[in-house]
Every structure is written in structure tokens, then in C-alpha cells.
């Protein structure tokens, strides 16, 4: 199955089955068990003020490897493999944004972290929004939102302005079709095609393969379940109520329309907004394509 360009927002995860196992990283790993019995793996490195990195849908904590090293020179960096992702336990339950937010709450509580900066890439931003909605911002100091639409699935009754502001790039039928693709025998091919749609033309084959292999760690049927929930979440009522210092990062050539990120910026009082141009790696994975600029931006913001 070949997806149309607008259907390739995130890497499409493969179906279950036999696949080559991606190589393990030498990043320092730890684990904890959630209240519903799921073992989550996380990377922790450095000391200082804490920053927690939350990856995208069907991706993994190792994708922040270019950030973990530099940031850990000044900060206590924690990058979590969310449930059923990466090295964390694969389970068929709790695959919804609200449970991922609960997992985050339990991790911060277990580690007794306060004044935490949260950085979320794509779905990771949705987890941050849900965390704030459910648990408030008492433990938090700052947030960084990287390339996530306020609402991914469009309503046929919307005006053009509503469509632009929401950043919706899928119809309801397209969501159903992608879920089916995730469970098909062609899912890994769909994954590889999807990756091509979310990186710039400057991305090397090795870089794309690394992203694919990270994606392949999540079974396709589980990815489909989480995707259905994630892509139907509407955060437009929550975003204007955020009262934390916020940095929004977008890519000019990203599948997530940059104008929707500008809408988020307008809604959050005092927020900062940065856009990577295409020549700067300004697609969905700008933190992988141009880690030097991304890291400088984050470190300046964190102070």
C-alpha cells in the first residue's frame, strides 16, 4: 500500500512479525514499573535541573541521542521509551494519550522531580498537553513543543481558517486506512515510504534507516491502536490555558503545517516560536537533521 504524501506525517509502524532487531545503544538505561504493571525503560544522564524528553508516536528515546550528550553537560536528562515503544514492555492496553500522561506523572513522582522542563516531539507534545490537563503544572518549569498539530484529523464542516489553525492533515477515512495499513503485510514498506515524507532531501540513507529501525521496535497493531487515539485528540481548548514558559519549534517544510504552530504561539501568552527552514533540516525530525542548531536553541531557552 502506498500512502499519499499528506498521509505520511509520522513513520508508519510495521505489523507484528519477524524483523531484524535494531542494535542496542550504549546510553545508560534504567527502568520502573507503572501502576498498571508495565515496565518502562528510560535513559538518564547528567546532573542539574531536570529535562524529560518525550518521543513521537511509534518512535523511541534513542532518537534524542544527539541531544542527550550535549544537554547532560548541564542538565539531568531523562529520555523515556513510552509504553510499547523502544525498549519498554510491549502491552496491548493503555495505548492512549491519557495513559501515557499518567505514566509520565508516575515517573516524575517516583524520581521525585520538580521544576521539570518537558520537551515533546510531535505526539510527545500531546502527552505534555494531556499531562497539564490532568495533573496541572505544579512539578513543571518550562515546556518545549516540537512540531505537533493541535488536532490532526479534520472535520468536513470546518472553515479554511479552522483547518489551517488546527493543522489537521488527515480525514477520518484516511485514519482508518492507515490503521489498516499498520496491520497489513505491507506495513514495513509503508513505514519506509512514510519516512521519506518526513525528512528533507538532505537526509542520508543511514539517517533514514536509523529512524526506521527505531520505528520498527513498536509492533504495528499496537501502533495502530495508539495512533487512532492520538490522531483524534483535540487540544485546541487546552492550549490557550497553558501558563508555563513555552517554546514552540516547527519546520517550514514539515508535514505539520507551520501555520498551525504559529496558532499555538498566538494562544500561549509569552511563548517563543522558532521555525527551521528547509535548508536547515526543517522537516519533522529537525532535531536529528540539524542537532547543532536545535541544541543551541534548547540550551539558550533553558538558560
Residue ranges and their predicted role:
Residues 69, 241-283:
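Conserved loop-alpha-helix segment in the C-terminal half of the alpha/beta-hydrolase fold
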Amino acid at each position: 500500500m502506498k500512502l499519499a504524501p499528506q498521509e505520511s506525517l509520522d513513520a508508519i509502524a510495521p505489523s507484528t512479525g519477524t524483523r531484524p532487531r535494531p542494535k542496542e545503544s550504549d546510553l545508560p538505561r534504567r527502568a520502573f514499573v507503572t501502576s498498571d504493571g508495565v515496565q518502562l525503560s528510560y535513559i538518564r544522564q547528567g546532573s542539574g535541573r531536570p529535562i524529560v524528553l518525550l518521543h513521537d508516536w511509534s518512535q523511541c528515546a534513542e532518537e534524542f541521542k544527539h541531544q542527550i550528550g550535549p544537554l547532560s553537560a548541564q542538565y539531568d536528562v531523562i529520555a523515556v521509551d513510552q509504553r510499547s515503544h523502544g525498549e519498554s514492555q510491549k502491552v496491548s492496553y493503555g495505548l492512549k494519550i491519557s495513559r501515557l500522561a499518567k505514566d509520565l506523572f508516575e515517573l516524575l513522582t517516583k524520581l521525585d522531580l520538580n521544576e521539570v522542563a518537558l520537551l515533546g516531539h510531535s505526539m510527545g507534545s500531546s502527552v505534555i498537553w494531556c499531562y497539564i490537563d490532568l495533573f496541572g503544572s505544579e512539578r513543571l518549569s518550562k515546556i518545549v513543543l516540537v512540531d505537533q498539530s493541535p488536532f490532526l484529523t479534520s472535520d468536513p464542516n470546518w472553515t479554511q481558517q479552522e483547518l489551517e489553525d488546527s493543522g489537521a492533515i488527515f480525514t477520518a477515512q484516511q485514519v482508518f486506512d492507515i490503521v489498516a495499513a499498520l496491520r497489513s503485510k505491507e506495513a514495513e514498506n509503508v513505514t519506509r515510504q512514510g519516512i521519506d515524507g518526513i525528512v528533507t532531501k538532505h537526509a542520508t540513507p543511514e539517517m533514514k534507516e536509523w529512524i526506521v529501525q527505531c520505528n520498527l521496535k513498536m509492533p504495528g497493531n499496537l501502533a495502530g491502536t495508539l495512533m487512532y487515539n492520538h490522531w483524534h485528540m483535540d487540544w485546541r481548548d487546552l492550549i490557550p490555558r497553558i501558563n508555563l514558559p513555552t517554546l514552540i519549534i516547527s519546520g517550514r517544510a514539515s508535514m505539520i503545517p507551520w501555520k498551525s504552530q504559529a496558532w499555538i504561539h498566538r494562544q500561549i501568552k509569552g511563548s517563543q516560536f522558532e521555525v527551521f527552514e528547509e535548508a536547515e533540516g526543517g522537516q519533522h525530525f529537525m532535531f536529528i537533521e540539524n542537532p547543532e542548531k536545535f541544541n543551541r536553541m534548547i540550551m539558550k531557552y533553558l538558560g
